Amino acid sequence: MSITAQSVYRDTGNFFRNQFMTILLVSLLCAFITVVLGHVFSPSDAQLAQLNDGVPVSGSSGLFDLVQNMSPEQQQILLQASAASTFSGLIGNAILAGGVILIIQLVSAGQRVSALRAIGASAPILPKLFILIFLTTLLVQIGIMLVVVPGLIMAILLALAPVMLVQDKMGIFASMRSSMRLTWANMRLVAPAVLSWLLAKTLLLLFASSFAALTPEIGAVLANTLSNLISAILLIYLFRLYMLIRQ
């Protein structure tokens, strides 16, 4: 059977509309978890204020020079802030991926589904999803730091890994290998969706500061919710595409 991107886009749109409230609640809950965890593990406001003390920003030629000009205490605060942001984001993304994929599975099985039920049902696979998303993010970031293009290619090749891990109960590395092989064979169907997702996330990041007009916390939750909705659409597309490819 010939698979067209247009038909998968149409199926994705229909599912997203029909399950919008459930997906929205999952996205909102994951955004709230991300923001709360980030706040809990981040340095205090007083510690963050120390990052500006005695650091000659205008005289620094780059990020590495800026970090080198910091005191050991400031470097530790920066490391803690970065680790808190990364950890909270990975937790939120893992719960989002598990929740959205479980929504699709439950709806496909004809069962009633709620946001809490989907997240609860995904609990057993969350540790594996967390590790998978961590490894995927690490590989993509390394690729982007090198020449950008390798990072984009890795993001595309590993896109199906979360779906395979949950749907077929694969191991972490097995799902990554299988995703690379299957995506390479169906690049024309996967690449445009992943690149559109990356573009949408980048545009959202550019306008994220405008959400802080309310309060920083509410703005962060709103921005993360929109980001999660964008990721949910991609997950629905990839799940539907994977089911069609397997037929």
UniProtKB/Swiss-Prot annotation:
GO terms for cellular component: plasma membrane. The keyword Cell membrane applies. Its main location: membrane. This is UPF0259 membrane protein YciC. The chain crosses the membrane at residues 20-40, 87-107, 118-140, 153-173, 187-209, 225-245. It is found in: Cell inner membrane. It comes from Escherichia coli O139:H28 (strain E24377A / ETEC). It is a multi-pass membrane protein. Belongs to the UPF0259 family. Keywords: Cell inner membrane, Cell membrane, Membrane, Transmembrane, Transmembrane helix.
